[in-house]
Amino acid sequence: MGRAHTVSRGEDHPPIARSELPDDTAALARYLIGKLVVRDLPEGMVSGRIVETEAYVVGDAAGHGFRGMTPRNRSLFLERGHAYVYLAYGVSMMLNVSSEVPGIGTGVLIRALEPLDGIEIMRRNRGVERLRDLARGPGRLAAALRIDRSLDGLDLCRKGPLWLAKDNQKPGEIGQSTRIGITKDAARLLRFYVRGSLFVSGPRSLQE
């Protein structure tokens, strides 16, 4: 059985201090489970609880930083806690968090959120009603929060248009698996998720 869905009361969400973020990519991916992504939009605040992440570590052939820095991926090489936003397959934006010291191109992909604040705004952004489907998967998540390339390089440890925040609830049991849709370094157990959450993406076999 999954955890009961709980809606934030819209309280102020202070950003996470950078010093609290682990400086190891896999550790950061696990740490971010249960934390909040907060988006400040003209219509109001939107937020969600992180229920699924993937780590892309040093020497990882599946990572965007594997072959070095380029104009497209330079935000991945910033100090941990910055946004790396890119367009995947010409279709969907992807939100990542840079994860180590400056110059090391590693990051954590935020794969899924449990919607909290601004659910009606998310529904309009996504054009769907079903709560479970608003931010279940990285492309849906980005659409629900209206993530675009203008946010690339943003410091997520400071309040602004987008930031990371703590939550006052424990996330539940955290599972670990191989990453989704990866063909290089595919055997690594670098995906983290809340077991039994209705808001986790991927096949059922990777949700338990």
From Swiss-Prot:
Organism field: Mesorhizobium japonicum (strain LMG 29417 / CECT 9101 / MAFF 303099) (Mesorhizobium loti (strain MAFF 303099))
EC number: 3.2.2.-
Family under the similarity heading: Belongs to the DNA glycosylase MPG family.
Family matches, as PANTHER family: DNA-3-METHYLADENINE GLYCOSYLASE
Keyword DNA damage: yes
Keyword presence, DNA damage: yes
Record GO terms (molecular function): alkylbase DNA N-glycosylase activity; DNA binding
Region: Disordered, residue numbers: 1-20
Ranges in coiled-coil conformation: none
Pfam families the record matches: Pur_DNA_glyco
GO terms of biological process kind: base-excision repair
HAMAP family: 3MGH
Enzyme class: hydrolase
Official protein name in the record: Putative 3-methyladenine DNA glycosylase
InterPro entries per UniProt: Formyl_transferase-like_C_sf (IPR011034), MPG (IPR003180), MPG_sf (IPR036995)
Keywords of this entry: DNA damage, DNA repair, Hydrolase
